[in-house]
Amino acid sequence: MYRRILVAVENSAADRTILDHVRQLAALTDAEILLVHVADGWAARHFNDLQLRESEEIKADRAYLEQLVASLPGLKVTTELAMGDPANELIRLVEERKADLLAMSTHGHRFLNDLIRGTTVSKVRHMVKVPVLLLKAQ
């Protein structure tokens, strides 16, 4: 059914919701999990243009991805730390990495975060050509 599940994570409690679900799905289908975090701060958006060294924030993002890998024993898990606009990067990576499913969490009603994250979810789900699994964060 699924061979590669791209899971968008954001270093928040919402990640646990989506990972708990995807862990079971990947085990049932023997799918690889591709954990993707998109760093979208100013330094991340200009990282390549300015040839910057990794900031502490980017190092922390890499460490977080490795923690998530360690929390998924027995599963095939790879990671990708992308930099830039979250929606554009997720759309690009779904295609480049040949994901069969995109899994993301949505948030409750936190106005400002809903405006930002809601825009990402809306854009991504309309632009990718694979099924999108959306789970509301607990």
Language-model features, listed with the residues they occupy:
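A short acidic, glycine-rich active-site loop
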Residues: 51-63
